Amino acid sequence: MKDCAQPLQHIEHGIPPVFDERSEALVLGTMPSPKSREAAFFYGHPQNRFWRVLAALFDEPVPEDNAERADLLLRHHIALWDVLESCDIRGASDASIANPHPNDLSRVLEKAPVRRVFCTGAAAGRYYARLCEAASGLPADVLPSPSPANAAWSLPRLVEAYRPVAEAVTPFKPPVLEVPRVVALERAIAEAGTPLDVLMRRAGRFLAFEARKALEGMEGAKEIVIFCGNGNNGGDGWVAGEYLDRWGIPVRVVTAKAPEELTAEPARAAALQAAASLGERSQVVLAPSNAEVTALLDGAPLAIDALLGTGFAHDTVKAPFDGWIRVLNVAHDQGTLVVAADVPSGLSAQTGRAAKDAVRADLTVTMIVPKPGLAAKDGAAHCGRVVVAPIAYIEPLV
């Protein structure tokens, strides 16, 4: 009764479509809700499950802001908009819509190779069929609404219902790039609007995401030991620790230097933020001995190696990292799962040559693109399974 008592309000859309010349699937809602208009982006209500569904479809973390949401769409060749350009509506109630006027979908369809159209809910499907289908020439698949009001559909059911969206697009396969080209690519990403500190947060979150998945099904304590170096690879580890702690997984962050002693940026800022945010069950372990590291790893189900990154190209590893690597490898042989950030420490990401002391990982989460050393020479023996973390939309840049 309360909703019916509200007057109809005339709403103009105002949010531009997300697409580019690579978009192959067009996903359409009906009209932005008040929360979406407030957020100036699609599906802005915090309880709306649209972004959780897409993240689950592509096995990646849920995007946290509008830039990440647009990035996810473009990386997966998905265009996103709404059927209506304006209407009279009561709150967020599609059932109350009057005087609907459609968006000009040719803005998308004339520039992007869209092959399939999807509508997120029955109302969007009805308005598309009535107002847009004749002009577009493309019928729409009507998907269940991801709105929290559609409580009959659980998140797993929604993910399966939306799977045709993932099947309608061509996956992008990132190229193998030599380390100097990766450095240049990171600069190009920054110049395109995603600075290095943002990339680091995305990298650390993806690392934490993969570590949390690896813990699933393990029995016993869910505690993770994270080895953080002094550079930006270590920064990824600090961010991972921050997220894991936030998700309720205690971490022990092993570091040779306190966060305030670090000089590399954005690693220093990331470490300071992470250290300040850790809860009571987590801790920072500063400059431990090999014996103390052994005790930390005793019974630990999983460890993250974020000591040395893609810039390493030496025959030996300096102390104390060499000793920590030896202890970590012993723990690995005794059953601790090891996840490496970008490249196992002590392995050259360029040549695949391993130093005297090099981490043996079960999983390597490499950032942005694969590097040649992950598969060359000693690479396969040290990397384990390799997952590429798609932390930026790079297709126009490579």
Regions inferred by a protein language model and the residue ranges of each:
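Generic structural signal for well-ordered alpha-helical scaffold segments
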Residues: S106-E110, A129, A208-E216, N329
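C-terminal capping/extension of enzyme domains
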Residues: M1-D20, E24, P46, G91-S106, ...
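Positively charged, low-complexity intrinsically disordered leader regions
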Residues: P171-A221, E395-V398
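Glycine-rich phosphate/dinucleotide-binding loop and adjoining beta-alpha-beta core of small-molecule
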Residues: G29, P175-L177, M218-F227, N232-V398
